[in-house]
């Protein structure tokens, strides 16, 4: 699978959510430098991919990863990589790098291989809980592609494959997505939104402080917000359960605890609605 890359970790989650089946992903190799991070990433089925700008000595390490990718494909598990080699929070597509062609051609020498162009379009790149569309295009038959170009030099095969893949991905990316406006009923639910904001305040405030002060690349913001939700929600749930059960009757504390489970998402949905009304 070959999606465009605009929203860091969120792009991989979109692919997983759309397919709902196991996949292995490629990610830039520099995030594997920490041994603990590398172990965690490999546990999540993410493999390191070096880029030309990382230096030729680093690119050699890709051949080790290629062997792992071969093993993944041999077992019938899809491999997903972002062929641009980096992310950009803009509509469109950066130049396709050589890595996707190297992997596809190498795999085609051993088995029937397809590359699936994938388009990901966000309603807003920086708003958490914004809309998103993921579209899978017609697979490119790599074996047929190579048979039709047997007489061409390798460099031309690479160039034509990258050009074809770029065209196929761009066909799937909506360059002017329609804003999906939320219902005006949100005004009536304003008190509920306030309650959700207060219940989840330690999570979203921590996330927003880190996003505003500690992250230079805003494209990582939504990934950070998601990670804060995943790691802090269980902790805060225990805290609220203790506080509410000691201070309120059960018939009031139970609904508040249930509301807390959805409060983080409700808070950001409300922010999205406010942004949407101003747009």
Question: Predicted regions: what is each one?
Answer:
Residues 148-181:
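Long, charge-rich alpha-helical interaction segments
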Residues 183-202:
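Transmembrane alpha-helical segments and their cytosolic interface motifs
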Residues 1-140, 146, 151-152, 194, ...:
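Soluble catalytic domains of membrane acyltransferases
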